[in-house]
Regions:
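Extracytoplasmic beta-strand/coil segments of soluble accessory domains associated
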Residues: 153-193
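Short acidic/polar hinge/loop motifs at secondary-structure boundaries
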Residues: 165, 193-221
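A beta-strand signature from Gram-negative outer-membrane beta-barrel systems
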Residues: 208-253
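Short strand-turn segments of transmembrane beta-barrel domains in outer membranes
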Residues: 236, 241-271, 276-281
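Periplasmic-side early beta-strands and strand-to-turn transitions of outer-membrane beta-barrels
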Residues: 246, 271-362
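Face-selective signature of the C-terminal outer-membrane beta-barrel domain
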Residues: 326-342, 370-547, 622, 666
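Membrane-embedded beta-barrel scaffold of Gram-negative outer-membrane proteins
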Residues: 389-395, 401, 562, 570, ...
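Gram-negative outer-membrane beta-barrel transporters
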Residues: 526-532, 618, 624-629, 642-727, ...
């Protein structure tokens, strides 16, 4: 019997091996189908792909669904095309339209993407726009291209209702009337990792953040500290990068424009079924637009106004750049990023006058401006076990901030008489400046788990997360000089310097260590098939450098009603906070001192939103009614930074999108109203420097039926009047002794941008013109209204190598 069994095994083994050898792998089936499709054997390709094993990797399934959709498109089988386009977007919600994708296929992707798109920011888990617990603005790569966007600020102010650009030493934003001197109330993330400074909370949404590597941007409008903690006061912006396998080669571009503007980008991507690599590099330089200002102009400031010039939007004497890498291997992901940005300040501080930028010496490789260089690395592990998903990460952030600030070419002013703001030798000299340097290192880790559950007819999921951050500020210094290059004073760490005429008041720069422990949870529960409860809270415990302990609770509760697939209604409440920055709590500047025990700012937000779609017209309408109450705003009261301000705002945000066969139109409109305020940059009716009415319209026309691969785009932005109150340091002449007395009205205005994009084989040609009609206008947000660039242009050549 044993001999017969052995003989049977020996005979069957070759047959089994032969059977295995003739069974093609999933990769071989896909390659065969691609070859058949390329030579027009569509039916054979379909037959091969219909037998594709569904257990293969998602990255391969994506290509299978794409190829099936293309095959059925060639057969004009609309039902099958729509089916596989939907499956493709389900596997890869971030699918990027390729150069060789047919126009009809690209239109179907665009028409279905917004409705089928998956979000990860709203709940830190995959979900649709319909089920997001708060109002979300989704900005795709095509939408970024449709406005010829150059900076993240331009993208956000165009597509996100309630966001308005502001001026200052760095690019700034207001959200629903809330802003500070730098952008530190909106949390900006790159693939979920914080980009805001850990010492100042600030991040400038300008050229230091490349857009070439971005696949989509998810914007949570409203308080979001329940998941993201500190800084997520008014909104969260998550930048989702492209995937290497979609880039599939090298992309390079070179741009040139007026005002000695140059920009270069490199993007490389490659991927297979268990690994993916994406690398990017972006470099930007611009002299900025130079305005020659006569001494009689309203833009000439100073105790004794003189003729001079200012540079607006200058980025030079170090250029601005963004370098990064994403590498995925199975369940592991590594992200590395290094960025630098330095913007030229139009005016000096202190007496707010024009200055000769080129006369000031280079210090640490920089001329005057606020420079930030930051580097971070994140190692992440993610896996799914049955109904539980686990995600763990470890990150390290290093930052070097250098503020090279000009006080004035000539400092003669009432300051000389009062002798209160500067040492004696400063008041009677020229070319006065100071340089502050901060270095800080932050490391930490985060782990979270998502558990799905089923309770009878009800289902949902539960999210639990823990986070730890360790912040260390070190090697901080302050230097002050005169005659454009001479360093007369240096203070490091906790050294002190006695200011003449100031009694015992001292200047110091503080080092220190701070720790933050966080725990957060969220539940998404389907009460009924059409009614969802989404709630959560976060607890943050912070130990400050002086051992003061901070405890913050951030709750959120949302009800989402989905009567059908075309309409939804959401009601939500959330509370958020932003802690007073480390630099504000430790950095004393002669006449301005931090109040002991400076506390976080808080925001309570109520929102009622609704979304409606009419698919035959590819029309989508979104409306959101909001009410916000901001408390503990940090303001300057009697030379002290203190928590004295509050602000109540309400408003209506609306957006509308049309998608026609060859025309895409998007518009948004915001009306916001100040209810009341205390000790804020506002009067009884207006928040200073922010309009009550904002409107944007964007249109992109595909001319492929007439001129293949040619697209035209246009944008019109309209803003109502604004009011501006001059800062404490502004002078308009020797008789102007009452600081901050002037309230000026800045008229309403509209700006028009146009552009075109043409593709030819592996090349793209793009031309964009901003402020087409060369309109003169000013933006507030700083101590004075600042002139903005007139008509500007930028031409781009881009090529791809696969």
């Amino acid at each position: 019997m044993k001999q017969l069994l052995l003989l049977w095994i020996v005979c069957c083994c070759p047959l089994l091996l032969q059977a295995q050898s003739v069974q093609p792998s999933g990769k071989e089936l896909l390659l065969q189908a691609q070859a058949d499709y390329q030579i027009g054997r569509v039916e054979q390709a379909i037959a091969t792909l219909e037998n594709f094993p569904s257990t293969d990797e998602g990255s391969m399934l994506e290509e299978v669904y794409r190829l099936l959709a293309l095959c059925y498109l060639a057969q004009d089988n609309a039902n099958r095309v729509n089916r596989y386009v939907g499956l493709l977007l389900k596997v890869d919600p971030y699918y990027t339209i390729r150069l060789d994708d047919p126009v009809r296929f690209a239109d179907l992707i665009r028409a279905n993407r917004v409705e089928k798109h998956t979000l990860v920011t709203a709940s830190q888990q995959a979900g649709t726009l319909d089920e997001a617990p708060v109002p979300v603005t989704l900005i795709t790569e095509e939408m970024i291209q449709a406005i010829g966007a150059r900076t993240l600020q331009e993208v956000l102010t165009t597509y996100v209702p309630g966001v308005f650009p502001l001026e200052g030493s760095n690019v700034n934003l207001s959200m629903r009337g809330v802003y500070t001197s730098t952008q530190e109330n909106i949390l900006i993330l790159l693939n979920g990792h914080r980009l805001n400074s850990h010492s100042s909370n600030a991040i400038s949404p300008d050229y230091r953040i490349s857009l070439e590597n971005i696949k989509q941007i998810e914007v949570l409008r409203g308080a979001a500290s329940s998941l993201y903690g500190n800084v997520a006061l008014t909104a969260v912006v998550n930048l989702i990068t492209k995937v290497g396998k979609e880039v599939n080669g090298l992309q390079a571009s070179y741009s040139m424009g007026n005002n000695q503007t140059y920009k270069g980008n490199l993007l490389f991507g490659q991927g297979n079924y268990n690994s993916d690599l994406l690398m990017w590099a972006s470099l930007y330089h611009s002299q900025g637009e130079k305005f020659d200002i006569p001494w009689t102009s309203e833009d000439a400031y100073g105790y004794q106004p003189q003729a001079g010039s200012i540079y607006v939007n200058g980025y030079n004497r170090k250029p601005t750049y963004d370098l990064g890498l994403n590498y995925v291997w199975n369940q592991f992901k590594l992200t590395l990023n290094h960025r630098h940005g330095k913007r030229v300040s139009p005016y000096s501080v202190g007496i707010t006058s024009m200055y000769d930028y080129d006369r000031y010496a280079k210090i640490n490789g920089n001329r005057p401006g606020r420079s930030t260089a930051s580097t971070f690395g994140v190692l992440q592990y993610a896996n799914t076990f049955h109904n539980t998903s686990v995600d763990a990460s470890f990150s390290v952030d290093y930052e070097h901030i250098s503020h090279y600030v000009v006080l004035g070419d000539v400092t003669t002013s009432p300051l000389t008489i009062q002798n209160e703001l500067y040492p004696d030798y400063v008041s009677d000299t020229v070319g006065v400046f100071y340089v502050t340097n901060w270095r800080n290192l932050t490391f930490g880790g985060e782990v979270r788990a998502l558990q799905k559950y089923q309770w009878g007819a009800m289902s949902g999921n539960f999210l639990l997360g823990l986070q730890y951050e360790h912040f260390h500020a070190f090697d901080n210094s302050f230097q002050m000089g005169d005659h454009f290059k001479h360093i007369g004073m240096t203070v490091t760490n906790e050294d002190s310097y006695t200011w003449y005429g100031m009694g015992d008041r001292l200047y110091f720069v503080q080092n220190g260590v701070e720790q933050n422990f966080s725990a957060y949870s969220q539940i998404k529960h389907y009460l009924f098939p059409r009614l969802i409860l989404n709630g959560g809270f976060r607890y943050d415990r912070k130990i400050r450098y002086d051992r003061e302990k901070l405890n913050e609770f951030s709750p959120r509760l949302s009800l989402i009603y989905l009567p059908n697939d075309r309409w939804n209604v959401k009601l939500s409440y959330a509370r958020s906070f932003v802690d007073a920055p480390f630099t504000s709590r430790t950095f004393s500047w002669h006449h301005l001192l931090p109040e002991e025990g400076l506390q976080p700012q808080h925001l309570d937000s109520w929102q009622l939103s609704s979304n409606w779609r009419y698919e035959p017209w590819h029309l989508e309408y979104d409306a959101n009614l909001f009410y916000t109450h901001v408390t503990d705003l940090v303001q300057v009261v009697e030379n002290l930074f203190s928590n004295g301000g509050n602000l109540r705002m309400m408003g209506l945000e609306q957006s509308l999108t049309f998608q026609f066969p060859h025309l895409w139109i998007h518009g948004n409109l915001t009306y916001q109203h100040l209810l009341n305020q205390t000790d804020y940059t506002a009067n009884d009716t207006y928040v200073y420097s922010v309009p009550n009415f904002l409107m944007n319209w964007v249109a992109e026309q595909d001319l492929s039926p007439w001129v293949k691969q040619l697209r035209l785009h246009a944008k019109c932005s309209t803003y109502s009047k604004q009011y501006f109150k001059y800062g404490w340091s502004v002078f308009h002449g020797p008789d102007d002794w009452y600081f901050g007395r002037d309230l000026v009205r800045m008229p309403a205005y509209a700006l028009v941008d146009v552009g075109l994009r043409y593709s030819w084989h592996w090349f793209d040609f793009q031309f964009d013109c901003k402020n087409l009609f060369d309109h003169t206008y000013r933006l507030g947000g700083s101590s004075v209204p600042i002139l903005q660039p007139g008509r500007s242009w930028l031409g781009t050549v881009r090529f791809r190598i696969r």
